[in-house]
Amino acid sequence: MTRRLRSTDPSLHRVCSVCRLLGVSKQAYYKHEDRSLFRLGLERFVVEFVREIRALDPGIGGNKLWHMYRQRFGERYSVGYNRFYDIIEQYGLKVRRRSRRARTTDSRHGLPLYPDLTREFVPSSPCRLVASDITYLPLNGSSRFCFLSLVTDCYSREIVGYSVGESLETRYPLEALEMALRRYEGEDLSRLIHHSDRGLQYASFAYTDLLKKHGVRISMTERGNPKDNAIAERVNGTIKNELLRGKSFQSVSEAREAVAKAVDFYNNMRPHWSIDGMTPVQASKCDGEISKRWTSYRDMAIKRAMADAGGAAALMQPAAAGCISASIQPI
């Protein structure tokens, strides 16, 4: 109100006169002006932060952005959850999902299959369970695709192996698996379960022989339900629809470069609700149960079943002290 009165003709409305008219002090007026300027500056600060993160992760959602904002700036530039969302919406920074599909799994083969070992298993430390899957990345200006193979640690959610190929040949999932095995060098791989769908690549002799050579137990989905390999499916979606959102690739080599940057950001900077807001690399330093910021009814059912069988203590060990503050280290 005061600002509107002054803007009509500043020569006619000095601050003192306007304040007397409205029954407020000059100090209150200038304090209000300072607060307004601070709010405007804070709004621009939030927008620049969101744009900075979106340059690295174009599809990251508002919840994680707000979590990262609070982690980085704390109370110095505090913005409430609702205000943060209002700013994102006001500046057109909300994201919308889109879909385009290519077939990546072909289970119509005569190769040996393996049982699902994960139905009643919850990993209690890294290098106990990994999930592998293949997704597609469209190439610009054509109906062609390249294919991303990922291997994810189901405890820490760290992507421990990846490869981008121009076809669905087994060599590319093998490259991702070899990277994962190097990541686990020195670990007891006889405790590790490798879980995947029943696709030709994962059932191939080249792939299963490499797993057996390192003593890794093989697990496969027993139905066509994506939920049977949910973690791998979720990570695929995060990389493709969030971190690579809106990006177009002229070639496979260009896609490989973008994927390398996306995986680095995902592992080292992006918070994950399934590991209590930590990054995957932070969680890889932990041991024992990590709190989730959502309810996993599957984990609850498994724990109840194990408790009834007297095996809960063997399934879940106490969390290591200080794991939440583990420092971020590059892989």
Where are these regions (language model features)?
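Basic, flexible linker segments flanking DNA-binding modules
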Residues: 19, 26-126, 225, 281-293
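Conserved, non-catalytic sequence blocks in retroelement Pol enzymes and Pol-derived host proteins
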Residues: 59, 73-76, 122-124, 139-141, ...
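A short acidic/small-residue loop/turn micro-motif
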Residues: 153-154, 164-171
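Mobile-element integrase/transposase regions
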Residues: 81-150, 175, 179, 183-184, ...
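C-terminal domain-tail junction helix/linker
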Residues: 212-216, 238-331
